Design a protein with these regions (language model features):
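Short, charged, surface-exposed secondary-structure boundary motifs
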Residues: 77-79, 138-143, 214-216, 259
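Short, surface-exposed amphipathic charged segments that create phosphate/polyanion-binding patches used
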Residues: 79-88, 144-148, 219-225
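A glycosyltransferase accessory/donor-loop signature
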Residues: 1-13, 20-23, 161-163, 168-271
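Hydrophobic targeting segments
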Residues: 6-11, 28, 39-42
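Short internal beta-strands
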Residues: 38-46, 131
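Histidine-anchored nucleotide/phosphate-binding helix
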Residues: 18-33
Length: 271
């Protein structure tokens, strides 16, 4: 029986995000020392050799692995023009990495502040994706085919993908078809795509795995009222997440990101 604690993780970014991705990856390594193995798959959208060397140097310090995968080749089946950077869609194609059945994906604007090993014990059953519930304009929830009863997950900060099931159910091609149906520009881009295609097979993670800005800005009852949500976390769950976050997601709304001057994010000092 194999009891090794192995984290398989993915990032997708262009060269100008390499600095932020590097800091996120460093925080991942630093807060998961107890993992037996960490493999980081980087979907490479023209990252320069100097930045690849820097990223490999971070991995070497922690005795971890970085694997670069050419994004253009990985996404070649999505033969449609889009207004958005192709890196944004990278997570839709991770099932092509056949040696991985369970993958954590991160955006570059995340900082890992705790162990993620408990995620390895989650029973995904028939769930295609697990993530933290997000706050979204009800109009866009309707646009992607969901109702107020559905819990929309944030696919930007951190999600857990059941790639074994993605391959079995051909989810990659279903995502491509959805993107093409909107001529390359579906509502909420990759997030809208994942929430639509996986709408009946999502698992909700505790909020500490993707602490997002609205959780700091509004009390729970106001969030439910503003976004017409029937189900959300309790105020106690949010407060506990703020005290002991596992991942902080520095999104651009409500607060400036911490690499900008005059950032007002309440956890900017962690960055």
């Amino acid at each position: 029986m194999n009891d090794l604690k192995v984290l398989n993780c993915a990032y997708s970014f262009m060269d100008n995000y390499a600095q932020h991705a590097g800091l996120s990856i460093l925080s991942l390594f630093d807060n998961n020392i107890e993992a037996d193995e960490i493999n980081v798959y980087i979907l490479d959208n023209n990252i320069c050799e100097d930045n690849k060397t820097r990223l490999n140097s971070i991995a070497k310090q922690y005795n971890r692995n970085i694997i670069f995968i050419d994004l253009a080749q990985l996404t070649s089946k999505m033969n449609v023009e889009t207004h958005f950077c192709r890196s944004t869609y990278g997570k839709l194609f991770l099932a092509q990495i056949k040696e991985v059945d369970l993958m954590l994906t991160f955006d570059c604007d995340t900082i890992v502040t705790g162990s993620l090993l408990e995620l390895l014990n989650i029973d995904m059953q028939d769930a295609l994706v697990a993530g933290v519930q997000d706050t979204v304009n009800p109009y866009f929830v309707y646009k992607i085919g969901l109702s107020n009863d559905d819990r929309y997950i944030n696919c930007g900060g951190v999600i857990l993908l059941n790639l074994k099931l993605w391959r079995e159910l051909d989810i990659e091609n279903k995502c491509i078809d959805y993107v093409i149906s909107y001529r390359g520009n579906p509502p909420f881009v990759d997030q809208g795509t994942v929430n639509h295609v996986c709408r009946d097979r999502k698992k909700i993670l505790p909020p500490e795995y993707n602490l997002i800005n609205p959780m700091f800005m509004f009390p729970v009852e106001k969030i439910k009222r503003l976004f017409r949500m029937k189900t959300y976390y309790s105020q106690n769950e949010i407060e506990n997440a703020k005290k002991k976050p596992k991942v902080i997601h520095f999104t651009g709304e409500l607060f400036n990101r911490p690499w900008f001057l005059n950032c007002s994010h309440p956890m900017k000092q962690i960055y």
